[in-house]
């Protein structure tokens, strides 16, 4: 899985990288970002793009910071509540879409009724 330039730049900002990373560092951060995005898509929200300003974007930053510290294996345990909440929101969104609800309509209107 590949991360976008926007997501890569978000990760650099989260890691406080103020220099131009060398090729090895860039590849490592991109690989960690891709692994984190894959994990979040698998366990939290399959549709998440992990863009800046989103819950999954912040979770991805947290994952990459853990990975950079050599502690990526602690992520699922330490952020379990956030992952479950994100998964619940995804499931509710899919359920609502299946019932004909749309986000723009608000909370109690359906299409075609």
What are these model-predicted stretches?
Residues 1-18, 111-113:
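Short, intrinsically disordered N-terminal pre-domain segments
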Residues 11-15, 39-40, 59-60, 76:
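Generic detector of leucine side chains in alpha-helical contexts
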Residues 22-46, 57-65:
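Amphipathic alpha-helical segments that form the core helices of the histone-fold
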């Amino acid at each position: 899985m590949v991360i976008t330039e926007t997501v890569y730049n978000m990760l650099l900002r989260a890691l406080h990288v103020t220099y131009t990373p060398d090729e090895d560092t860039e590849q490592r951060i991109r690989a960690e970002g891709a692994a984190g995005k894959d994990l979040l898509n698998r366990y939290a929200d399959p549709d998440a793009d992990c863009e800046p300003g989103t819950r999954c974007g912040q979770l991805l930053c947290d994952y990459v910071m853990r990975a950079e510290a050599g502690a990526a294996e602690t992520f699922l345990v330490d952020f379990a509540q956030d992952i479950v909440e994100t998964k619940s929101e995804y499931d509710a969104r899919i359920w609502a879409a299946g019932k004909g609800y749309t986000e723009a309509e608000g909370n109690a209107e359906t299409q075609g009724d």
